């Protein structure tokens, strides 16, 4: 019931109430996770709370909550790793972020999800001046995900030469 109340609060734009954890009457995602951490709903509550903490700019708290989430759903796991990577980027831990983006890009069989995180890993590699690694990611896009790319991977591969 507490998870459903948190979902309703989130749908109504009441993010603070959805996050909850401040009173027993409104446990929100945090309280639901704390009470039911070993269950699927508890783990999903940690994921949702992590996303809300990220939105608040509390990146370490968000990362810690996201880390507690697990699922057999491969797309959700890819999204988890991607969100954790965003936390690490905001904490200036770009090497860790790149590792998480690599995990995100291969966590799911969904082509768009894989494309999205492969592209992001390529861009982070470029920012870290890891041109060979960036080229690897952009070449993978060119080979596997042309339907989603609109020819941009060729531009990125060319950019690697001069960046």
Question: Could you describe each region identified by the protein language model?
Answer:
Residues 1-163:
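Acidic, polar-rich low-complexity tracts and alpha-helical solenoid repeat scaffolds
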């Amino acid at each position: 019931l507490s998870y459903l109340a948190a979902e309703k609060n989130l749908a109504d734009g009441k993010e603070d109430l959805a996050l909850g954890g401040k009173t027993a009457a409104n446990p929100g995602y945090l309280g639901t996770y704390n009470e039911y951490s070993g269950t699927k709903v508890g783990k999903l509550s940690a994921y949702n709370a992590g996303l809300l903490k990220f939105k608040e700019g509390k990146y370490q708290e968000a990362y810690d909550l996201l880390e507690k989430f697990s699922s057999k759903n491969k797309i959700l796991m890819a999204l988890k790793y991607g969100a954790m990577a965003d936390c690490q980027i905001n904490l200036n831990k770009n090497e860790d972020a790149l590792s998480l983006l690599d995990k995100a890009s291969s966590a799911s069989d969904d082509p768009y999800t894989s494309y999205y995180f492969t592209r992001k890993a390529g861009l982070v590699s470029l920012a870290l001046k890891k041109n060979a690694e960036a080229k690897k990611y952009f070449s993978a896009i060119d080979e596997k995900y042309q339907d989603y790319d609109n020819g941009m991977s060729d531009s990125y591969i060319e950019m690697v030469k001069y960046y």
